[in-house]
Amino acid sequence: MEFSVKSGSPEKQRSACIVVGVFEPRRLSPIAEQLDKISDGYISALLRRGELEGKPGQTLLLHHVPNVLSERILLIGCGKERELDERQYKQVIQKTINTLNDTGSMEAVCFLTELHVKGRNNYWKVRQAVETAKETLYSFDQLKTNKSEPRRPLRKMVFNVPTRRELTSGERAIQHGLAIAAGIKAAKDLGNMPPNICNAAYLASQARQLADSYSKNVITRVIGEQQMRELGMNAYLAVGHGSQNESLMSVIEYKGNPSEDARPIVLVGKGLTFDSGGISIKPSEGMDEMKYDMCGAAAVYGVMRMVAELKLPINVIGVLAGCENMPGGRAYRPGDVLTTMSDQTVEVLNTDAEGRLVLCDVLTYVERFEPEAVIDVATLTGACVIALGHHITGLMSNHNPLAHELIGASEQAGDRAWRLPLGDEFQEQLESNFADMANIGGRPGGAITAGCFLSRFTRKYNWAHLDIAGTAWRSGKAKGATGRPVALLSQFLLNRAGFNGEE
């Protein structure tokens, strides 16, 4: 689908469809008023007859409106004018895309960027419209034999901006929106792949393909089990012992800043391509969704794709920590004591608390890059789902400025995160009689104690942890990966690169 921006009055638009908003109760938006005036009151007359109230989600498609060059006008209900927020704006865009697709419009000029969204500028509105449009049109049908295609799919969307001065920021918004949307799609595609296809080797192949596609700035190295043993990554290796699939760690290095002094931002993604729970096996109900336990790695992959596509002037390293947690004759057991790469020892009380065992060794490994900051992304705890539900990602950090940056980026991107504490009193729950620490700390504050566990391996750099257990995928009829938190991390890196969208 092609996107562009232009600046012009609606009466001069010659298109298959013009899209404008209507507020409650039957109030035309400024552009809709212009079209009404051109058509000698044709639109307002329809509203007076009760054809459209302007409630959110309502639509009215008009054909051959008098004196209007475009074939059709799509009126979209936007609710009460002063109450239009970011979430409702995205819902309006989503409804627009679905309606245009369902009614066979192949192109449209969209004036919805004129809508007032509190605290948001035209750059934000155009970029969010692009991201939302791509999200709305997403489908995962690679493995289906019968693929459904819209009769006349929407191919071109033009966003109108108020003045020619805003064309440049509008074009940048489209560029950024397309790159972020492509990253989200890549993350969703990886997450939705079944575990018999998407194993650690598959993740590694995708990482290599990324380097091939962006060979000027991207290098990928894949570290196998033999090299992990030499490095002392015993906790990571233990998790994969029960599986016949080799554990592989894919390291994607992007260099956009040629300065020798430029330190990288490191992103670490948990990549459990299937998590049965191991010997502490999970209940069978819903176990199919444990293919989504690699969504942290999928998100990091999507972000690295975005960074490479936009050629951001920063250095970023993405680590996909791929492995599979299965029961078997070689599987690690409750009661085992593991010596991690940091030489700290861990008593395993539950083999289903495996993500932190993988991550702790990777967090030690990335010390070699002397990072400016490290952010790990993981579907880590069911406790985070209980605490924050399926709408907000959990955030923990050992560095207040980094945490504030990430919270700010989450608000900018509409991919929200909420900070949880890392108090010393929670560390006490990880005490073990037989090792330096246990891998679980009991039910109380489970998301926080998991973060506390990881914090013991991050003392040499500024670090943040994103627990996406509640936000990485949806269950039920709409089952599928969400691609979160690609948008959050993309915004964070755009801000670090100097593109904060405040034009």
Swiss-Prot record:
What is this protein's function? Presumably involved in the processing and regular turnover of intracellular proteins. Catalyzes the removal of unsubstituted N-terminal amino acids from various peptides.
Residues where Mn(2+) 1 binds: D275, D352, E354
The EC designation for this entry is: 3.4.11.1, 3.4.11.10
Quote the record's cofactor note: Binds 2 manganese ions per subunit.
Per its record, what are the GO molecular function terms?
manganese ion binding; metalloaminopeptidase activity
Reactions the enzyme catalyzes: Release of an N-terminal amino acid, Xaa-|-Yaa-, in which Xaa is preferably Leu, but may be other amino acids including Pro although not Arg or Lys, and Yaa may be Pro. Amino acid amides and methyl esters are also readily hydrolyzed, but rates on arylamides are exceedingly low; Release of an N-terminal amino acid, preferentially leucine, but not glutamic or aspartic acids
Q: What class of enzyme is it?
A: hydrolase
Q: Which PROSITE patterns match?
A: CYTOSOL_AP
Compartments reported by the entry: Cytoplasm
Query: Where, in this chain's numbering, is Mn(2+) 2 bound?
Result: K270, D275, D293, E354
Q: Does the keyword Manganese apply?
A: yes
Its GO biological process annotations read: proteolysis
Q: Which GO terms describe its cellular component?
A: cytoplasm
Q: What family does this belong to?
A: Belongs to the peptidase M17 family.
Q: Which Pfam families match?
A: Peptidase_M17 (PF00883), Peptidase_M17_N (PF02789)
Origin superkingdom: Bacteria
Under which name does UniProt file this protein? Probable cytosol aminopeptidase
For this protein, the record's SUPFAM superfamilies field holds: Macro domain-like, Zn-dependent exopeptidases
- Active site (catalytic residues): K282, R356
InterPro entries documented for this protein? Leucine_aapep/pepB (IPR011356), Macro_dom-like (IPR043472), Peptidase_M17_C (IPR000819), Peptidase_M17_leu_NH2_pept (IPR023042), Peptidase_M17_N (IPR008283)
Q: Which UniProt keywords apply?
A: Aminopeptidase, Cytoplasm, Hydrolase, Manganese, Metal-binding, Protease
> Which co-factor is required?
Mn(2+)
